[in-house]
Amino acid sequence: DSVNIGILANKASTARELLARLSTAYENLPKWMQQGILVWNKGNIELENGSKILASSTSASAVRGMSFNILFLDEFAFVPNHVADSFFASVYPTITSGKSTKVIIVSTPHGMNHFYRMWHDAERNKNEYIPTEVHWSEVPGRDVVWKEQTIANTSEEQFRVEFECLGGDTEIEILDDNGIVQKTSMENLYERL
């Protein structure tokens, strides 16, 4: 059976880089597992069994009219909100038409946007997405020494944003001990804890 995969990212160059990594993995398969190749370039791969992989930037028209078994969306929180909204409006009919279609969304959080709504709705079981978090400390080779070196090479703020997923200027609402809703930044909340 053939499989159609869409790799979409906030920038076309990022999607092409992901396709290049997948291409390298394919090249390292034993020859007997590799299918014949019909198309092999920076933007797509097509195999003789009919399977296709497309790499593109996320936009409303990027995959319109196409059908996919797997749709991989990278750094989706960095796709402008109006683009993310129109993208899902145009692609959702395709997603729901397949019985086994999978949508995989990967991102570092980036403010309160389409990704934020999807994530928080998933946490509250308001949609069918399954939120999965991978903390930096779960990645082999990343320990306290790695953290300290990374902070020394960048900054504590950058580490919190990129690895702890805490944006210092991200505004949130919290309920204080008196039941009063207050707006605060993630940085202020982080310092309070």
Predicted regions and their residues:
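Phosphate/NTP-binding elements of NTP-utilizing enzymes
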Residues: 1-167, 175-192
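GGW-centered surface loops in extracellular recognition modules
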Residues: 172
